[in-house]
UniProtKB/Swiss-Prot annotation:
Alphabetized Gene3D superfamilies for the sequence: Cytochrome P450 (1.10.630.10)
Keywords tagged on the record: Endoplasmic reticulum, Heme, Iron, Membrane, Metal-binding, Microsome, Monooxygenase, Oxidoreductase
Amino-acid positions noted as binding heme in the UniProt annotation, renumbered to this chain: E328, C468
GO CC terms, sorted: endoplasmic reticulum membrane
Family: Belongs to the cytochrome P450 family.
Superkingdom of source: Eukaryota
Name of protein: Leukotriene-B4 omega-hydroxylase 3
Cofactor: heme
Length: 524
């Protein structure tokens, strides 16, 4: 039969045997692959069997739609954490398992694993790549390790010290705007709107040494960043839109590409200008001129960075890291600070104690300005910030997909290739980690109370090798802005309680509104 089937090609019986052999080899290879997949699925099932799972909606949907990015979804997550305090297994449809870990003792193995073992889940982070390139947030492997080492000096306290002046100035601009709005009779303000512009204003000055005056007038670059952030958050909730081919055809996809072009052109123009400046001045003269102003911006540090072999970052790498810092630095800090203001508005006794601490620190000082050394002199204000970051973490979850099996401290195993969610919100709201977790209590972070706690019980900036490289920058900015705000204004809760909305960062549906009253001159 095989001879006849080949005769029309002009091939005789003598070539039939090799074809039979090839067909047999091909069939054997396919069968082997199927058996390997079956064995892997069986092996994974055995490991996954050790993780409890809530009842599925049905066999087809699995647990899809149980924990939604809404206030109700966070309440459901809180219920699940109370029921399964170590973590639980959920299914996306009938075939895709996702493990959620929500206890500080359990997440240690994942967070402390090397960046090469515990990779970020590429499915989500890939949608950021057209905007952020291979910056620290998106990259992996050797490239990530090299960039992390080269960027670490950018966040040394000697670099950060002069930024405190910028934080003061940007906060002053925001407060001047508040005073005008209040004098016009409007004292009800959306904290997210105002604080986001303030953090973008600071970042643009710290990253590019560029003042767009974005808090007072519109800026194409700032508008593009805000639009990109909104589009990414929207796309994150639409799994079908993860396919680039489909997304690029939609109106949102077209707006995304247009906004990317605006951001990239701005960053590229700054880099080109710095390259022109460096040859004209020479490196020594350039550093001397910067020393006079006492400020090296982020672009300067990236341009001057060299790895162990003396190689510099490419312009493409510099753009990716600058764009990443603008993205990561504004939304997370704005979320953190907005919720801090909200929590202090709801707890006037803590607000007043923070205010007195700031007043005592700045007594007799003109102008009223926070300096770098002051940041360590605000212990109660720092406790209030940390407790707010626990109760309302800006980033509620991080995802990992491990390249090898991960053994957990309790003996269970997370199989290679399984998506693992580390629920920062879940850990922070876990009653077996934090007693009465829904209560805002800054004294949890009193040095005497916190000393025996697990270092992984509080991870608003993640932890381990891939922790947030800019956490000192963020904490410094929040301290400055909060201290000056409490010095000048009284914060009061709005009549309507906000509904939390976990997107890329923790927001509030329709904004986070507070009432703001200026303090009399004699009050501070």
């Amino acid at each position: 039969m095989s001879q006849l089937s080949l005769s029309w090609l002009g091939l005789g019986p003598e070539v039939a045997f090799p074809w039979k052999t090839l067909l047999l080899l091909g069939a054997s290879w396919i069968l082997a692959r199927i058996l390997i997949q079956i064995y892997a699925a069986y092996r994974n099932y055995r490991h996954l069997h050790g993780f409890p799972q809530p009842p599925k909606r049905n066999w087809l949907m699995g647990h899809v739609g149980m924990v939604t990015p809404t206030e109700q979804g966070l309440k459901e997550l809180t219920r699940l954490v109370g029921t399964y305090p170590q973590g639980f297994l959920m299914w996306i449809g009938p075939m895709v398992p996702v493990i959620t870990l929500c206890h500080s003792d359990i997440v240690r193995s994942i967070l402390n694993a090397s960046a090469a073992v515990a990779l970020k889940d590429v499915i989500f982070y890939s949608i950021l790549k057209p905007w952020l390139g291979d910056g620290l947030l998106v990259s992996a492997g050797d490239k990530w390790s090299r960039h992390r080492r080269m960027l670490t000096p950018a966040f040394h306290f000697n670099i950060l010290k002069p930024y405190v002046k910028i934080f003061n100035d940007s906060t002053n601009i925001m407060h001047a705007k508040w005073q005008r709005l209040i004098s016009d009779g409007s004292a009800r303000l959306d904290m997210f709107e105002h604080v986001s512009l303030m953090t973008l204003d600071s970042l643009q000055k710290c990253v590019f040494s560029f003042d767009s005056n974005c808090q007072e007038k519109s800026s194409e670059y700032i508008a593009a960043i805000l639009e990109l952030s909104a589009l990414v958050a929207k796309r994150h909730q639409q799994p079908l839109m993860f396919m680039d081919l489909l997304y690029n055809l939609t109106p949102d996809g077209m707006r995304f590409r247009k906004a990317c072009n605006v951001v990239h052109e701005f960053t590229d123009a700054v880099i080109r200008e710095r390259h022109r400046t460096l040859p004209d001045q020479g490196l020594d003269d350039f550093l001397k001129s910067k020393a006079k102003s006492k400020t090296l911006d982020f672009i300067d540090v990236l341009l001057l960075s060299k790895d162990e072999d003396g190689k510099e970052l490419s312009d493409e790498d510099i753009r990716a890291e600058a764009d990443t810092f603008m993205f990561e630095g504004h939304d997370t800090t704005a979320s953190g600070l907005s919720w801090i203001l909200y929590n202090l508005a709801r707890h006037p006794e803590y607000q007043e104690r923070c205010r007195q601490e700031v007043q005592e620190l700045l007594r007799g000082r003109e102008p009223e300005e926070i300096e770098w050394d002051d940041l360590a002199q605000l212990p109660f204000l720092t406790m209030c910030i940390k407790e707010s970051l626990r109760l309302h973490p800006p980033v509620t979850v991080i995802s990992r997909c491990c390249t090898q099996d991960i053994l957990l401290p309790d003996g269970r195993t997370i199989p290679k290739g399984i998506i693992c969610l580390i629920s920062i919100f879940g850990i922070h709201h876990n009653p077996s980690v934090w007693p009465d977790p829904e209560v805002y209590d800054p004294f949890r972070f009193d040095p005497e109370n916190i000393k025996d706690s697990s270092p992984l019980a509080f991870i608003p900036f993640s932890a381990g090798p891939r922790n947030c490289i800019g956490q000192t920058f963020a904490m410094s900015e929040m301290k400055v802005a909060l201290a000056l705000t409490l010095l000048r204004f009284r914060l009061l809760p709005d009549d309507k309680e906000p509904r939390r909305q976990p997107e890329l960062i923790l927001r509030a549906e329709g904004g986070l509104w507070l009432r703001v009253e200026p303090l009399s001159a004699g009050a501070h």
